[in-house]
Regions:
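Predominantly soluble domains enriched in secretory-pathway, periplasmic, or organellar proteins
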Residues: 12, 17-170
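Bacterial N-terminal signal peptides that target proteins for export
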Residues: 1-6, 16
Length: 170
């Protein structure tokens, strides 16, 4: 009986879901912005909506690319990173967190001018970065299987969430 209830519910919901997906307009290319000299590959992207900047983890260059979306050009490249993979702008702390796979560190930059304000050592393969705006926390996947919970005010790891494998994306 439960199986039939689930099938009935799915059949009623399915047209609404597929209709919503097909009713929206397709994406339209508005502009192309060359990233400049990036050797190797890029990884995750972050966005600073306030300043209209795209943040590009340039893993192959060991740098962070900063793109001015309003002007449609690269503003700068921040060197000295170690295989940056994850990047996120943290609006409630006006800072940028960059996770580095090469040395397992997280570099923290001031949002206004992207100058360094801190560094958090996670030990191994820091990767993806996510922002929890409800709890005012930053989450960074790292190592063989963990999420570091970071307080963006004290710039310290306050907890670990253990996982069964490396969190490539979450």
């Amino acid at each position: 009986m439960l199986r039939w209830v689930i099938l009935l519910a799915a059949s009623l919901i399915w047209p609404a879901v597929t209709g919503a997906q097909t009713a929206s307009a397709p994406l339209i290319l508005e502009a192309k912005i060359p990233l400049g000299q990036v050797s190797g590959r890029i990884d995750h992207l972050g966005i600073d909506v306030k300043r209209r900047r795209l943040l590009v983890a340039e893993l192959g260059n060991n740098s962070l690319g900063v793109v001015d979306l309003a002007a449609g050009k690269v503003l700068s490249s921040i060197a000295g990173l170690s295989e940056p993979q994850g990047v996120a702008y943290v609006p409630f702390a006006d800072s940028v967190f960059v996770a580095n796979a090469g040395d397992g560190s997280v570099h923290v930059l001031r949002g206004e001018n992207l100058t360094p304000i801190g560094r958090i050592e996670l030990g191994d393969d820091a990767d993806n970065v996510r922002v929890d705006t409800a709890r005012h926390r930053v989450l960074v996947g790292y190592g063989k299987g963990a999420l570091a919970v970071i307080d963006p005010v004290s710039l310290s790891k306050i907890a670990d969430i253990r996982l069964k494998a490396h969190p490539e994306g979450f």
